[in-house]
UniProtKB/Swiss-Prot annotation:
The record marks R323 as: Important for acyl-CoA specificity. It comes from Burkholderia vietnamiensis (strain G4 / LMG 22486) (Burkholderia cepacia (strain R1808)). Pathway: Amino-acid biosynthesis; L-methionine biosynthesis via de novo pathway; O-succinyl-L-homoserine from L-homoserine: step 1/1. The gene is metXS. Transmembrane segments: none annotated. This is Homoserine O-succinyltransferase. Its main location: cytoplasm. GO terms for cellular component: cytoplasm. It holds the Pfam family Abhydrolase_1. Keywords: Acyltransferase, Amino-acid biosynthesis, Cytoplasm, Methionine biosynthesis, Transferase. Belongs to the AB hydrolase superfamily. MetX family. Substrate binds at R221, D355. It catalyses: L-homoserine + succinyl-CoA = O-succinyl-L-homoserine + CoA. It comes from the Bacteria.
Length: 381
């Protein structure tokens, strides 16, 4: 199926200060966005795609100067794809605090002329949603046909349906959770500790020292990456295979160098991530994950938290996802059904763990395609 082709990001500037959940204020900030497809005359066919931890506004297509720069959800978004850009106008927004062009720790603080670094305020999922709403306003979009996301993106989609109930017709929440478990918070803490203890971190102001805390960021990514894969998937991909340049496949080196294929894979993923991602951004986004808990203001009652929602919902989970297990999605489904909301739920039998939401699985894509067909009929797309 064809890609959407060459795309280009655009930078949107916002002069009105944004008050954050922490009480801090971000003034004169920018957000980088990409759009795909055409907004119809009624402005009724817009879909917002929210990104997960290490992704960005670059949802689909490629950049003219880099043919390898395929968007992170290119198999999902494009002409004739499950989210069909021949029918829908799709927006991807790079969130505040990120390192891909939107205002974040790498940006210059207007008050000092130096990068914010550790001074950049902690942001939350709710802060991102408020910022995204301003993007919608700038496009003249009063109501999204759908807000969609996987993992952390799914949390944003759910938050949209809570915070702007009259602006979301459909919420598509994939491989997500209503809040992080203690185990998930613990994984994030270990990852952050790896970064914070890196000698090159310099209290978050490493830009001024001309270094990056790559060692810590590398370990953080390795920890995270393990949680994105299933045990079965790792067994099939790597098993206990040894990595040997000399062809001696059955002998140990009796050292702490790379011995197993899975070690080599994790080191490769860690090195690649540390080259392009920012450590301060990693700290911010993992903390935003930790803080997301819409039921907190309702004494932990998710049903009460979702009482004022108006959207229709598609909730999807994957059988081997142990980071955000299907049981967590079913918590959302139950709370919505308790509120007599219209909910479709699917647990997809897929071997790939949490990362399955990013992959091209026929059953998964057929589900999303069928749901968008329903939305298209509603909005005349």
């Amino acid at each position: 199926m064809e890609s959407i082709g060459i795309v280009a990001p655009q930078t949107m500037h916002f002069a009105e200060p944004l008050r954050l959940q922490s009480g801090s204020v971000i003034g004169n900030y920018q957000l980088v966005v990409e759009t795909y497809g055409e907004l119809n005359a009624a402005r009724s066919n817009a879909v917002l795609v929210c990104h997960a931890l290490n992704a960005s506004h670059h949802v689909a297509g490629i950049y003219a100067d880099d043919p390898r720069s395929t968007g992170w959800w290119d198999n999902m978004v494009g002409p004739g794809k499950p989210l069909d850009t021949n029918r829908f106008f799709v927006i991807g927004v790079n969130n505040l605090g990120s390192c891909f062009g939107s205002t974040g720790p790498m940006s210059d603080d207007p008050s000092t002329g130096q990068p914010y670094g550790a001074r950049f305020p902690v942001v939350t999922v709710e802060d991102w949603v408020h910022a995204q709403a301003r993007v919608a306003d700038a496009f003249g979009i009063d109501r999204f046909a759908a807000v969609m996301g996987g993992s952390l993106g799914g949390m944003q989609a759910l938050a949209w349906s809570l915070m702007y109930p009259d602006r979301v017709a459909h919420c598509i929440d994939i491989a997500s959770t209503p809040k992080l478990s203690a185990q998930n918070i613990a994984f994030n803490e270990v990852a952050r500790s790896a970064i914070l203890s890196d000698p090159d971190f310099h209290g978050g102001n490493y830009y001024a020292h001309g270094v990056k805390p790559k060692r810590g960021l590398r370990v953080a990514r390795m920890i995270g990456h393990i949680t994105y894969l299933s045990d079965d998937d790792m067994a099939e991909k790597f098993g206990r295979a040894l990595r040997r340049a000399d062809g001696a496949l059955d002998a140990y080196n009796f050292s702490f160098d790379v011995e197993f294929e899975v070690e080599s894979y994790l080191r490769y993923q860690g090195d690649k991530f540390a080259d392009y991602f920012d450590a301060n951004t990693y700290l911010l986004i993992t903390r935003a994950l930790d803080y997301f808990d819409p039921a907190k203001a309702f004494d932990g009652n998710l049903t009460a938290a979702l009482a004022h929602t108006q959207a229709k919902y598609l909730i999807a989970s994957f059988s081997t996802d142990w980071r955000f297990a299907p049981a967590r999605s079913r918590e959302i489904v139950k709370a919505l059904l308790d509120n007599k909301r219209t909910v479709s739920y699917a647990e997809i039998d897929a071997p790939h763990g949490h990362d399955a939401f990013l992959l091209d699985d026929a059953r998964y894509h057929n589900l999303i395609r069928a749901y968008y067909e329903r939305i298209a009929n509603e909005v005349g797309a």
